[in-house]
A protein has these predicted regions:
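Phosphate-ester processing/binding pockets and catalytic centers
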Residues: 2-71, 76-353
Length: 353
C-alpha cells in the first residue's frame, strides 16, 4: 500500500457518477425460490454484499448514455493440473458504447506490431504482446464501461450445486438431458452450470428491462460445436428466470467468429488474461507463500491493473474456498499495489456510490 493522491475535480466526479449504478439492489435472490437455489447463488449474493459492506463495491450503470445491449464476454482459467483454483472471469459491459475502444485497439495493434495475434495469457512469453499489455489495459480502463468480475473456486470443493456425490451428478445429468444438451463428463457439467448461474446472477444484478443480452464465450468444452452452443444458450434461457423476472428483449450469443473479429476478441481477451493471471498467482501464493510467490511475466501488469477501478471499468474478484474448519465460505479478494504510477489520481469512492 502507498499514500494515494485524490482528485475532487467536479467534472471527473460527474462523469464517474453517470456510468456508475448509484442505487443497486443486492438482494438478487428472490424470496419465492431462494431456498431452492444452489449454493453458488448464495455465495455470489454474499460476496457482493460483503464487498458493499466494506464500502468498496462499485457497479456499472449499463443503461447510461442510452445503452440498449449488455455484452458479456467470459473465459476461464486454472484447468491445468498444477493449479489449485478454477477461475471464471466475466466482462459485463455496455455493448453500445464500444466503438471508441474498437478504434483505439485497431491503432494499438498496428503500433505494437502484434498484428492479428490474439491477446492471451498463455502467450505472455512473446515480447511484443507482453510489452503492449500496459497500453491495452489502459484502453480497457478508458473506453469500456462495465464490470470485470472473477469468481475463484478452490479445487478441493467438488461441486457448488450439492455435496459432489453421485446424487449431485445425477441431478446435473438429468437437467442437461431435459434440454437435449446431451451427456457430458461430470466436470464439464459442473463447469457449465457454474458459468450459466454466474451469468444469470450478473444479468439479474446489472441488466435493465427491455435490454438485449449478448454473451460470447471462448471455444470450450461447454460448447464445442455450434449445435451444442445453441443448446447452451437455451439452458441459460431457462436458468435466467430463477434469478429475475425482468423482461429482456433478446438473449443471444456466439463463439469467436471465423475469420477472427478482433473487435470481439479483444474484449474476450480481457476475461482470458484476468482468469489466467489470477489462477496462476493464487496458486503460487498458496504453494510458496505471499513473499515467495512467482508471478508470470506480464501477469504483474494485470495484477497491478486489477488493484483499482477506473471511472468506467469496475473490477471485483471473489472466492469460494474451503475454510480451516472444513466448511465452505466466500468473500472478496483484494490485490494491493505497493508502488504508485506517475500521475495516478483517485476519486474518493464515497463520492460516486
Amino acid at each position: 500500500m502507498y499514500p494515494k493522491r485524490f482528485t475532487f475535480d467536479a467534472r471527473l466526479i460527474e462523469r464517474a457518477r453517470v456510468v456508475t449504478l448509484l442505487s443497486s439492489d443486492l438482494n438478487v435472490l428472490c424470496d419465492e425460490n431462494r431456498a431452492e437455489l444452489p449454493g453458488l447463488a448464495h455465495f455470489l449474493e454474499q460476496g457482493f454484499k460483503a464487498r458493499d459492506a466494506e464500502g468498496k463495491l462499485l457497479l456499472p450503470n449499463l443503461s447510461a448514455l442510452a445503452n440498449r445491449t449488455v455484452g458479456i464476454f467470459s473465459d476461464y482459467g486454472g484447468e491445468d493440473s498444477a493449479s489449485r483454483f478454477f477461475t471464471y472471469s466475466f466482462l459485463v459491459c455496455a455493448f453500445g458504447s464500444l466503438d471508441p475502444f474498437k478504434q483505439q485497439m485497431a491503432t494499438l495493434r498496428d503500433k505494437s506490431g502484434i498484428g492479428r495475434k490474439e491477446i492471451a495469457f498463455k502467450d505472455f512469453r512473446w515480447g511484443p504482446l507482453r510489452r503492449m499489455l500496459p497500453a491495452y489495459l489502459r484502453l480497457c480502463d478508458s473506453y469500456i464501461s462495465g464490470l470485470l468480475f472473477t469468481l475463484v473456486v478452490d479445487k478441493t470443493i467438488p461441486s457448488l450445486f450439492g455435496p459432489g456425490d453421485a446424487e449431485t451428478t445425477r441431478r446435473m445429468t438429468d437437467a442437461l438431458e431435459e434440454t437435449g444438451y446431451g451427456s457430458v463428463a461430470p466436470r464439464v457439467g459442473e463447469k457449465l452450470f457454474r458459468i450459466l448461474h454466474c451469468i444469470a446472477f450478473l444479468v439479474a444484478l446489472l441488466g435493465q428491462p427491455g435490454q438485449k443480452i449478448f454473451w460470447m464465450t471462448d471455444h470450450d468444452a461447454i460448447g464445442e460445436t455450434p449445435e451444442q452452443h445453441r443448446k447452451l444458450l437455451g439452458i441459460l434461457n431457462r436458468v435466467l428466470p430463477l434469478y429475475t423476472n425482468k423482461p429482456f428483449s433478446f438473449l443471444g450469443g456466439a463463439r469467436p467468429f471465423t475469420p477472427r473479429a478482433f473487435e470481439y476478441l479483444d474484449l474476450l481477451s480481457l476475461a482470458d488474461i484476468a482468469a489466467g493471471t489470477i489462477a496462476q498467482t493464487l496458486t503460487s501464493i498458496d504453494t510458496l507463500g505471499e513473499e515467495n510467490a512467482q508471478i508470470k511475466d506480464g501477469g504483474d501488469h494485470v495484477l497491478r491493473w486489477l488493484c483499482h477501478n477506473s471511472i468506467t471499468l469496475k473490477k471485483f474478484v471473489m472466492t469460494v474456498k474451503r475454510l480451516p474448519n472444513g466448511e465452505v465460505g466466500c468473500g472478496p479478494i483484494d490485490f494491493e499495489a505497493r508502488t504508485p504510477i506517475a500521475d495516478e489520481l483517485f476519486i474518493p469512492t464515497q463520492l460516486v456510490r
